[in-house]
Amino acid sequence: GGGHGMGGGGGGGAVRLATTTTLTISGRVLANGGRGGDGTSGCCGAGGGGGSGGAIMLVAPTLRVVTGATVTAIGGVGGVASAPYGGAGGAGGVGRIAIQTTPSTCTLAGTFNPALVDACNVTTGAGTRGRVHISALP
């Protein structure tokens, strides 16, 4: 954006993991926004905004996200202001996670941010905005 102050954090980008067999995630899949820059003293010390969370798409007939695994697409934190000029930067917006799988062969025991709505069940209706979206493979 315009104006004075520090730069915003980078966006989270996009990650797509797809297979025609089994996808097992036992580590971390991240598409998180970067931290905004801190303000500088003396002039124009507003902190930069955090980068927006990115997008993650997991596609597999059989999907396993094991306990201890993490799948996140969150916004970065805003930078710190430098007194007395400016304010702190705002946080970046939440990203999106989409899953296409066969619900009967899906196990989601890991941590998701944004959060799951209803485990491996197909996501429908209201109350799902800002959450993990799950659809059945055709």
Residue ranges and their predicted role:
Residues 1-16, 24-57, 66-101, 108-138:
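Glycine-centered low-complexity coil/loop motifs and glycine-rich tracts
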Residues 20, 60-61:
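Parallel beta-helix/beta-solenoid
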Residues 62, 103-104:
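Short, polar loop motifs at secondary-structure junctions
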